[in-house]
UniProtKB/Swiss-Prot annotation:
InterPro entries: G_CP_dom, GNL1-like, GTP-bd, P-loop_NTPase. GO terms for cellular component: Cajal body; cytosol; endoplasmic reticulum. Residues 164-438 form the CP-type G domain. GTP binds at residues 212-215, 387-394, 431-434. The gene is LSG1. Residues 630-652 have a biased composition (Basic residues). It comes from Bos taurus (Bovine). This is Large subunit GTPase 1 homolog. Residues 288-347, 625-652 are annotated as: Disordered. The lineage of its organism: Eukaryota, Metazoa, Chordata, Craniata, Vertebrata. Keywords: Cytoplasm, Endoplasmic reticulum, GTP-binding, Hydrolase, Nucleotide-binding, Nucleus, Phosphoprotein, Protein transport, Transport.
Amino acid sequence: MGRRRAPEGGTLGRALIRQQVQRSRSHRHTDSWLHTSELNDGYDWGRLNLQSVTEQSSLDDFLATAELAGTEFVAEKLNIKFVPPEARTGLLSFEENQRIKKLHEENKQFLCIPRRPKWDQKTSPEELKQAEKDNFLEWRRQLVWLEEEQNLILTPFERNLDFWRQLWRVIERSDIVVQIVDARNPLLFRCEDLECYVKTIDDNKENVILINKADLLTAEQRSAWAEFFKKENVKVIFWSALAEAIKLMGNSKGDVNGDTGEAITAEFENSSCDEAEILHKETEHLSLGEAASSEEDESEYEDCQEEEEDWQTCLEDSSSSDEEACGQDCKEGHTVDSEAQGRNTPQKRQIHNFSHLVSKQELLEVFKQLHSGKKVKDGQLTVGLVGYPNVGKSSTINTILGNKKVSVSATPGHTKHFQTLYVEPGLCLCDCPGLVMPSFVSTKAEMICSGILPIDQMRDHVPPVSLVCQNIPRHVLEATYGIDIIKPREDEDPRRPPTSEELLTAYGCMRGFMTAHGQPDQPRSARYILKDYVNGKLLYCHPPPGRDPVTFQYQHQRLLEKKVNGGEIKLQVVRNKKVYQIENVVDKAFFHQENVRALTKGVQAVMGYKPGSGLVTAAAVSSERGAGKPWKKHGNRNKKEKSRRLYKHLDM
């Protein structure tokens, strides 16, 4: 009886044969590993390109246009430029910066704020809302045109219409509109179109710029800014909410050392005595002008302290009738008192700015005596505080009132709705929410360093830290943090500013900020340094137009002179005296010499060399013999180590 066959015994063999045949067939139509090339030296029978092209990429479009124009391109070889990673600073060159400044001056008139559309008693609430939305949309389109067509960078302005509605209400109900700006860069936070809009609503309203954080400026720097705004015919007041709050807190506690807040301004008390007397005379002169104009017609605006729901844009019959009557009274009053206005115009336009820091009482007196025209509400002076977020509007109100009436936060845009507060009978302060108004900037790094954009939400830390390194000299950074920043190479400029990597590496090593791989945590270090820059620990003040930034920051030069002359600079930690410098890789490889060693075999020392132990001195040999342990065979260590493995790096 024969052997029984498997039910599908021949299936595997036929499958392998079939796979081999299919592989040979497919190999004929696929590319092989052999090197082939298309020479295209024969006649092209498919020369007619009948392929339809409806869309092309930018590169294909450029090449097709060049082919139609008959342009030929030749590869440019041996023109290689190596850009190291540390050169990625994200900052503009001098030529690019000058070009952008020129574009800013040419398109300066397009920077405006949205206006409230005109309305009367016949306008319905729906029509007014639709008109406001249309004007706001047109304003948004104009700013988008600036960004796209002119390639300009704008600050992230406010895009919520409700915030602008609150600004309109504050301006309409204020007799004095105060713009609060940062003393380190006043022109960035100043909105010139807001001043024009205030005068458009009512010519009797006054514009004032309150320069907060002025204690960060020296007396010479404040004098320079006061002279600049005097030429611009703008009234400015130098004020520091934090310094005044410390001063008032010390006085209220009755401490013997309660003049700690006064120490900030004690340097300038002697130079500001004459200015205080002139200011007193000016306030008396303005009080006489106010008494002369107190007989003007009274406006019938509603009270400043209203509920939140009364500040909507919807039209109310009572408010509309009052405002229409007020408009008629304004027209009549303008025709009657035109002669008196003409006599007071030269006195109004004459601006006297003083560079000393004002106190709380001086600030209130200036507010009271500044407005000499017709008030919005009879017997009450309303001062509206507007400006960018995080410039100190709420802090100013808390300092003036003496207690915390408005919540304060380091986060920009903390105030969500306006508030009206009475300082005393007849004086009302109105705190407007912080509005980021459109302004020109060069880079987004400038917005981060100015406090406009939050530091904790930044994505790239290199450009803002590079801007800090450009503004703050090397010796100031080293003296502030007690660090030693690595020096430039010998072939580099020794006076160049440090890069962001050099600063963050030194700061991270000093603070112990390390990543999981043992490297300095540069993003974390960048957040600390940028917050110190925004808070004023690393101080840089922008000069007025036309002034040299280096000479304007003369305190940096004084610190360098003290360091050169051997003056004491108090550091936070003990500094290492060793100066680290960036090593030159080419020089290190050129001057590097390998160690010369003698190769021996056996366990006996030859010419002073012992296998595995290197050079052996006579003292070591005598001490080894005197130990009395001849059975110890220490010479067997690394005795059989092959030399070709130890010195394989010397082979070609």
